[in-house]
Structure formats: structure tokens, C-alpha cells
Amino acid sequence: MRIILLGAPGAGKGTQAQFIMDKFGIPQISTGDMLRAAIIKAGTEMGKQAKSVIDAGQLVSDEIILGLVKERIAQEDCAKGFLLDGFPRTIPQADGLKENGVSIDYVLEFDVADEVIVERMSGRRAHLPSGRTYHVTFNPSKVEGQDDVTGEPLVIREDDKPETVLARLGVYHEQTAPLIAYYTKEAEAGKTEYLKFDGTKLVAEVSAEIEKVLS
């Protein structure tokens, strides 16, 4: 079961990724984690290449990232499948997977309108010292603007400010709209299965739908 997840930041992808991993016993493969591991260990040839590029402050090429992905999915814990999150981000990367013989069984897209995502994310409030988070609509603190435990002020993290969220959504649409078209076409050709979920539904509802189609 080889799965790619597509969805804007704040669309609930991370929550459903965790559900799929727990339910089906497959690992999540994050290119960010792989690059961090390459920096620490640099155990393989690809890892060494990635480390030297990162140390030089340069962007890691698709070729190196694809090499790291191939190495990672050859490991024992990926025998039953894996979940790719945050990769591929571009058409050349999607082509690269195909050229490297990595077939994908399911592409899952989590669809949520931009204005809903902005409301979800800009409503978040954080108590930075403890890491406790709240939401003005969905999970409010007992006293507005104050942490429940300490009474200290809550803040809006930089990442959750509406202008930051909108900028991230702009990047997502620019990069991912072509991928949606790409994998829809692959599905029409019978090479993968493309499934779209309404990310505005309750988490448990979306999880139940995913379980049904993947079982």
C-alpha cells in the first residue's frame, strides 16, 4: 500500500496520516526527516551528498531527494507500504518517482476551501512556555486570551497569522494544482487510484471513509 497525501497546510493531512499509519502499520516518509537524518548520520552515499549540499547552504536537488526516498523505501519497515507526505511537490519529482520504478497505489487529496483554512489556522492561540494550544472557536480557553493553567497571555504564532497562512496557501496551489491534474490523469490511465476527501468533515468521518476505501 503505497500512498501519497495531497492537501494544503491546515487541511487535516497530518491527523489522517497518523490514522493511516496506526491503522495499517505503514511508516510515514517525510523528506524533511530524511534530510535531517542525512545531516546527522550521513551514513550512505546519498546521505553524504545531501549533507555536503546542505552544509554549503544550497538547495538539495531532486536527484538526491529521489535517491534518499529510494533508499528509505527499500528498508524493511516499508515492506507493506508507506505514506509519502510533502513529496512529490512538483511534476519533475512525480516523474522521477515513476522513472525510478516507484509505483503509487493511492493518491489521497484533502480538499478544504482557503477561507476555511484561514479561519482554522488564524483562530489558533498558543501558550508558548508549555506548548498548550487553543482555538477561539473550536477549543477556546476558559478566559479569553489566557492560558487555562497559568493564566498567562496567549499569542498568535507567526505561522498562524492570516497573511502567513495566505502566503503558504498561494505556494501550495501554485505547486500542487499541477500535481492534482497529473495524478488524476495517472488514475484515468489505471496507474493509480485518486481519492478526494472533504476535509471540512469531522476527523472521525474522514478517517472512516479512508478506512473503507483502503481496506
Swiss-Prot record:
Binding-site list for ATP: G10, A11, G12, K13, G14, T15, R124, T133, Y134, K201
Gene Ontology biological-process annotations: AMP salvage
Region (LID) location: 123-160
Keyword match Nucleotide-binding: yes
Primary location recorded for the protein, binned into one broad class: cytoplasm
GO CC annotation terms, alphabetical: cytoplasm
Pathway listed: Purine metabolism; AMP biosynthesis via salvage pathway; AMP from ADP: step 1/1
Region: NMP, residue numbers: 30-60
The UniProt record lists the keyword 4Fe-4S: no
Family (UniProt): Belongs to the adenylate kinase family.
UniProt domain comment: Consists of three domains, a large central CORE domain and two small peripheral domains, NMPbind and LID, which undergo movements during catalysis. The LID domain closes over the site of phosphoryl transfer upon ATP binding. Assembling and dissambling the active center during each catalytic cycle provides an effective means to prevent ATP hydrolysis.
Function: Catalyzes the reversible transfer of the terminal phosphate group between ATP and AMP. Plays an important role in cellular energy homeostasis and in adenine nucleotide metabolism.
Name the record gives this protein: Adenylate kinase
Source organism: Aliivibrio salmonicida (strain LFI1238) (Vibrio salmonicida (strain LFI1238))
